[in-house]
Every structure is written in C-alpha cells, then in structure tokens.
Amino acid sequence: MTGGAMDPLPTAPGAAAAEAEVDEEADPPAADSPVPPVSEPRAPDAGQMQVPPGNPLLLSLTLQELLARDAVQVELVPEKKGLFLKHVEYEVSSQRFKSCVYRRYNDFVVFHETLLHKFPYRMVPALPPKRMLGADREFIEARRRALKRFINLVARHPPFSEDTILKLFLSFSGPDVQNKLKESAQCLGDEFMNCRLAARAKDFLPADIQTQFAMSRELIRNIYNSFHKLRDRAERMVSRAIDNAADLLIFGKELSALGSDTTPLPSWASLNSSTWGSLKQALKGLSVEFALLADKAAQQGKQEENDVVEKLNLFLDLLQSYKDLCERHEKGVLHKHQRALHKYSLMKRQMVSAAVQSREPESMEQLESRIVQQENVIQTMELRSHFSLYCLHQETQLVHVYLPLTSHILGAFVNSQIQGHKEMSKVWNDLQPKLRCLFVGPHGAPAPPRPPQDGLSAH
C-alpha cells in the first residue's frame, strides 16, 4: 500500500520552509506509536484471538451460534432519589456468566470508551444519548431498550465476547466498576498490540481488499437506508395498532355508557319504551367484545414492537456501527499514516537542504536519527493500516452473518399479522349474533341486519 513511501522526494525550492514545517508537524498520537518491534515476540492477552488453522481472516460462524453466545437482559430498577436528581439504575443479567449486576448509565459510558480504546478497528455499537433533566418514562424506556441492544451486540461479538473487560462489566459486583474498567484499559494496549497476527495481517488480505472494502461499504449503506425506512414504517404500524386499541376501548365504553343511561323517556316516546330498553341492554353487552378487541389490538402492537421493531433496531445498530467503523478507518489510521508519510517527506527535504548548506556533522546526525525514528513510525502505521483492513474484512463478514436475521424479522411480522387478524376475526364473529336484537321488525320480532338503501348511504 505504501510502495516507495520512504524514497526521497525531489528537492523543492522551499527547503527552508519545509524545515520549519517539520518542526511544527505534530507527532502521531501515542496510541499508534509505542509498539514492540515486528521481530520481537509479544504475549497476547488471554482473551485475544488465537491463530486458528487455515486462513484466520475467514469467520466460520452462523447466526444461531452468535445468538447462542449470550442473552443479556437489561431491566429498570425502581428509581432511587439522590440529593437533587433521580438516578436511573439498571439490572443487567447475563445468561452466559450466570450473573446479575446493577449498572448506571455512566457505567455503560466508561465500558463503551474502554471498548473503543481496546478495539479501535472493530464495530463498537453506539450508546443512546444521555438526558440529564426532564427524562420522561418514554425516554427512559427507549434508552433501556437501546442499552439492551448495545450490550447484546457486544456480548455476541467474537473478539469482545472473549475479552476480560466484558466479563468484568457483566459480572463484577463491587462498588466501583468504572475504576476497574479504567484500570483494565491502562494495563493493556489495544488489539493491535496484543494480537499475534497483527504483524502478519497483510499476508492474509486479498489483493483487491480496497475494492472489496468500497463495494461492501456501498452495499451496507444501501441496506441500512432500506431497513431504516422499513423500521420507520413498522413503527407507524405499531403506533396505529396501539391507537386502534385505544379507539376500540373508548368505543366500547361509550356503548356501555349509552346502555347504562337512566334518563326517563318523555311521554310521547312511551310507546317505544320497550324497544329502547332492549336496545340499551344490547348496547351495554357489546362493550365486553369491544374491550376484548381492544386487548387483542394492543397485544398485536406490543408483539410487533418487540419482535419486529426492536429487532430492526438491533440490525440498524449493527449497520450503524459498521458505518462508524469505516469512518474511523478513513479518518483515523489512514489519515495518521498519510500525516506520517508527509512528515517523512519533509524530513528528507530538510536533509537535502542541510547537505547543500554543509551543516555541522552533529546536526546532520540528529536529523538522520529523526528520519530513522520516523521510518519506524511509518512502518508501525503501515502495520496498523493493514491490521485495520484485516479487522474490517472480518467485521464485514460479521454483518453478513447477521443478515439472515432479516428473514426472521419478516417472518415474525407476517406471523403476527396472521395471528392478530385471526384472533380479531374470531371476536368480531362472536359479536355479530349479539347485533340481532338491535334490529327489531314491525311486530317487535328481531330482524336480520340489512345494508342501508342507496338513499341512506353516506356520500
């Protein structure tokens, strides 16, 4: 990727200006600089990827295997009042670790930061926003759902699931989990520092990795856009189901109120008093079915919220984390690599300028030493760039492992619609016979309902 990067560039007229620019150029961040030499053996963290047989670049996972790694529940704990603010606390229980711990939102924030520090080249899902004041129940519930999606994506992610910080977050029940997480992050470097494959990542990459990366990024962007629209439509359908439930319930209550009315009839209507009494009794009885219809509609809306909308949100969170990773790759390691190359070229120009001006040997030696140091920095950047592409390739595979989840979501939606309409239809059919008493014939006998005549039809 950087062929000829260390070759000296042609001498430019502005060598003196270049020399000044070298001195002003910032060194690459510490996270990318201190690495052991390539030839020096490095003991990996116990939880890091080991070298599997075959090509370690390829993942051999199924969706079922991913989902079986863990199932983490996040539930709200009853509010605890602080001196000024109410604190929201979550009960986090892991099936895998058989643990149950209590976490605050800020604990999730530190955990998220630790993941980004340790796994900068992996998909780290975003956290929901923090809202200090005026957090209503709806916001708190939405944030709980988002935190549950976040921790489940992390707990099932191959490298994350084997790392000690995940176990620490899910099982440590001590008083200060945040300090424990920070201490863990300070003791160890990032994944590049601890992975035994990091120095050889380039050997496993396909020759057209850049083309593959561009194509995958475009494909996943399109998938994200489509599923974002599907999620929005699904949310609207759930909202309509809940509104329909509320309307049916009110409809039934109004029928019940009408049937319970005790206002006496005027004398001129006394001839029809028996008819009105029968109608009231029938209307009052219909409210039971409408309450049942409302309950069925609410159940369908709730089921689709959990089985369709929430799973679509999980899938979108995953895709968004992939998009964020692509941006980190381009704006992070690639940008730092280009800066290191630029700084190196300026040093080489400065070297040529110093030779022309016949500077003292000591200053030349210092400059040569700085150039050697910069060459080491560039070598590290190249290794990190290749390792970043290596991780990106694996994360792309992981997204494709999750793709069958979309068929599960669609199946859940269809089944919910079938079941919901089936149950609603049964209640409507049970209600129909009760309507017969509402239609009284000329001699007081019940008459079957008939469609309205054209002259009475609504226009």
Curated annotation (Swiss-Prot):
One GO cellular component, as annotated: early endosome membrane
BP GO terms, sorted: early endosome to Golgi transport; intracellular protein transport
Cystine pairings recorded for this chain: none
Keyword Transport assigned: yes
MF annotations from Gene Ontology: phosphatidylinositol binding
Residues in PX domain copies: 68-176
Function (record text): May be involved in several stages of intracellular trafficking. May play a role in intracellular protein transport from early endosomes to the trans-Golgi network.
Family from the record: Belongs to the sorting nexin family.
Record's protein name: Sorting nexin-8
Biological source species: Bos taurus (Bovine)
Top-level taxonomy: Eukaryota, Metazoa, Chordata, Craniata, Vertebrata
